[in-house]
A protein has these predicted regions:
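N-terminal nucleophile
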Residues: 1-283
């Protein structure tokens, strides 16, 4: 993912609402939103590219109440193409029977094997004690992004947040605008899984921001401008999918994915279900 907007326990009916865009090269093969054949309790799209590591996902949900999503941290000067695919981390969290703290601790030695990332992990398996955390193997020091030697999960308080290709809530223009429009959509949402267009409308906004508002992330100004919209579209790279996930406090959920190519058309998948929290899952 390259833009994740999320509401955590800030709506009377929903525990978690996520509206996200995944940006990628058009030629990179990706499996559409579906239940995974090798982990049949996990729902999400999936990377089909030939990469080092487990086939991952940018955003996924498991029936036992786990959610995870990931963005890369834009730092072109330090990017190493030989490291493991970051989407592997979300797949590992969803497929393992570990708490958030146990998972981060178990992966501690492996975090150096990934380029910079932001990882969201939620555990809704216990309705009386839901948890959402943000974890990154990078930190901001002296105005520059540095590698973090020891990684700790940061607990997220109830509220509305935006995450792109920098630290959590870094006020990039797309994050500021996205959070504001997401908050409006949340306020209008009556908790009935209807009116998804309230979310997809702003996710599909291709308007670039003025150069004076853009961050300096190490790419040239033309590319900085091309990457600035919520919805990106260039010749070879762009927003490949928009995803809306809504999880009610009773454990019912809806996930909608819209998939895009270089044309203006899209394909859509919508799946609804019920989390089986603290119960034996049998699919």
């Amino acid at each position: 993912m390259c833009l994740i907007l999320f509401s955590w326990n800030s709506h009377p009916d929903y525990s978690l609402v996520v509206a996200a865009n995944r940006d990628e090269f058009y030629e990179r093969p990706t499996q559409a939103l579906d239940w995974w054949t090798d982990h049949q309790t996990i729902l999400g799209s999936r990377d089909n590219a030939d990469v080092l590591g487990m086939r991952g996902t940018a955003l996924g949900l498991s029936l036992d109440g786990k959610f995870s999503a990931i963005t890369n941290i834009r730092a072109p000067s330090e990017k190493n193409p030989d490291l493991r695919t970051r989407g592997e981390l979300t797949a590992k969290f969803l497929s393992q029977k570990l708490s958030i703290e146990e998972f981060i601790q178990a992966q501690q030695k492996s975090f150096m094997q990934y380029n910079g990332f932001n990882l969201l992990t939620a555990d809704l398996s216990k309705p009386e004690k839901p948890q959402l955390c943000w974890t990154s193997n990078r930190m901001l020091m002296g105005g520059k992004i540095r590698q973090r030697k020891v990684v700790h999960p940061v607990t997220i308080d109830p509220g509305i947040y935006g995450l792109s290709n920098a630290m959590l809530d870094t006020p990039w223009p797309k994050v500021r605008q996205g959070v504001a429009q997401f908050a409006q959509a949340i306020a209008m949402d009556q908790g009935k899984f209807n009116h998804p267009e309230h979310y997809f409308k702003f996710l599909n906004n291709p308007s670039a921001f003025p150069d004076s508002e853009l961050p300096a992330t190490g790419v040239n100004q033309d590319w900085e401008r091309a990457l600035s919209p919520l919805f990106i579209k260039t010749e070879h790279y762009g927003t490949r999918s928009s995803t809306l996930l809504r999880i009610r406090k009773d454990g019912s959920f809806q996930m909608i994915e819209r998939r895009f190519d270089q044309s203006d058309k899209y394909e859509s998948t919508s799946i609804e279900g019920q989390l089986q929290r603290s119960e034996q899952i049998d699919r």
